[in-house]
């Protein structure tokens, strides 16, 4: 691989200005329960902070399927209301799905959601590749506005999922 990489926390910066968020979470539920929850677009509002002003406009009336278009509004910063159009591009039942932004606040957004059965529950893995808009200005505000907002969103989601399903307990030997 050519280029350079600077890693801070769970975000990666590359010479092409594509950033990466990579998170893991274990929950004490079955793979089927996790899939049923994560595969229902209505639940996105449940695991999104209220401060984001998340509101689904269309596309959440069915379980997730490849080709599904979901349209919603968000208010991520400074009270600015934005429309976000997402397409579910890939689905493998009880294993993974991919959502990609078609129109919205990012220059690029590709989010892979993986589910894996583990002893005592399920492990969820998220890999998001994204690019901020507005060229150099976007890159300058990324560490002060975009990255902290994404940190907040994923931390809220993790906390909310624990509230809903309980904390995963690791057995000590």
For each feature predicted by the language model, list its residue ranges.
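Hydrophobic ligand-binding cavity/cleft-lining segments
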Residues: 13-65
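Short, surface-exposed coil-to-beta transition loops
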Residues: 20-22, 81-85, 108-111
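Beta-strand elements of well-folded, non-transmembrane domains
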Residues: 27-29, 76-78, 90, 105, ...
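A short, structured loop/turn motif at beta-sheet edges
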Residues: 31, 89-96, 114-123
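Glycine-rich portal/gate segments that line the openings of hydrophobic small-molecule binding cavities
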Residues: 56-103, 156-159, 163-164, 168-172
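Beta-strand/loop substructures that line and gate deep hydrophobic ligand-binding cavities in soluble
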Residues: 101-152, 172
């Amino acid at each position: 691989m050519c280029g350079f990489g600077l890693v801070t926390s769970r975000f990666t910066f590359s010479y092409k200005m594509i950033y990466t968020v990579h998170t893991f979470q274990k929950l004490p539920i079955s793979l089927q329960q996790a899939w049923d929850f994560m595969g229902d677009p209505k639940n996105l509002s449940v695991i999104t902070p209220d401060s984001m002003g998340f509101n689904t406009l269309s596309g959440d009336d069915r379980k997730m399927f490849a080709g599904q278009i979901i349209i919603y509004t968000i208010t991520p910063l400074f009270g600015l209301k934005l429309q976000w159009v997402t397409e579910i591009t890939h689905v493998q039942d009880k294993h993974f799905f991919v959502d990609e932004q078609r129109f919205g606040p990012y220059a690029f957004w590709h989010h892979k959601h993986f589910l894996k059965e583990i002893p005592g529950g399920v492990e969820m893995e998220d890999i998001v590749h994204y690019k901020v808009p507005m060229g150099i200005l976007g890159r300058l505000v990324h560490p002060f506005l975009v990255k902290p907002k994404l940190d907040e969103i994923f931390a809220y989601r993790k906390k909310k999922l624990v509230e809903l399903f309980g904390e995963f307990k690791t057995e000590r030997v």
